[in-house]
Amino acid sequence: MELLELISDGTRLDVLLSKDGTLSRSRAADLIREGAVTVNGKVENKPSAKPAAGAQVVLTMPELKPALAEAQDIPLGILYQDAHLAVVVKPCGMVVHPAAGNPDGTLVNALMYHLDQLSGIGGEMRPGIVHRLDKDTSGLLMVAKDDETHKALSDQLSARTMEKHYYAVVAGVMKEQEGVIDTPIARSKNDRKKMAIDPLGRPSRTEWKIVWQEKDRALLDIHLITGRTHQIRVHMASIHHPVLGDPIYGVKNMPHAKRLMLHAYSLRFTHPATGEEMRFVAMPEECFKAE
C-alpha cells in the first residue's frame, strides 16, 4: 500500500488531496468516502471536511485493480499514440467513462479495445483518463498509458501549461471581436446537475475571439484557461450568448442546431518522456453545423 502524507492548509479534504494533480477531485472524494483517509490518525469520510491548518492527513492508496470496464470494438479516431500516451478524438454523444446509466459504449470501453495498456490512477472505471469532455462535446482528449505519464500530464493541467482550444457556435451577435470571461463557477444550489456563476465558486477563466459572425450566431475560437465542469457553456450563457444546441444552459428561441455546437479542436502539451512540444488539431465533424 502506498501512503500519501500531507499537512492540511485548512481547505476541503478532497481539494487538498487533488492539488498536486495525481488524483482528480472526484477520485479523491471517492477514496475519502471509502475510508482511505485519516486526519490526525482518525478516519475521515467526508470529502467536504476542512481539517484545521497543520493537521496531518494520510491517504492510503489502495492496490490498483484491473479495470472493471469491458473492452468493446467501438470505432475510435486515434490521432497519435506511442508507448506512453495517445491522443484520440471523442465523437459527439459518447460518454467518457462508465457510470450509472452508462455501463458500456463509452470512450473507456473503446480505449480498452484499441490500446495495449492504460494508466490506473483514474480508478477501475476511468483507466487512462487524464481529462474529460461532456457527453455531447466532441474533440481531442489525451490518454495516459502508464501512471508516471498520467501524473505528469495532470501536473501540466494543474499548472495550466497545457493549451486547449475549442470551437463553439453561440447564439446572438457579439458586440466585441474578442473578450475574456473571468467569473467563478460552482455547482448550482438549485439543481445539482447544473453549474452556475457563484462569487464563492472556483476561479474560472475563458478567452474567446470571433472566427465568423452571422445575423443570429457566431463561431468562436475559445481558449480554455481553467477546466471547470461545463465551463464554456456556463460562461457563454452568463454573457447571454449560449452555445447552440445546449439543452441545459440554452434559451428559448435561439437558432436550432443538430447537436451541442462545442468541439475541442486543438491541444498542445509537453511530452512527459521526451520533452517535445506536441500539438494536435482535429476539425469538427460534418454535423457541426447550425440550421
Please name every model-derived segment.
Residues 1-291:
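RNA pseudouridine synthases
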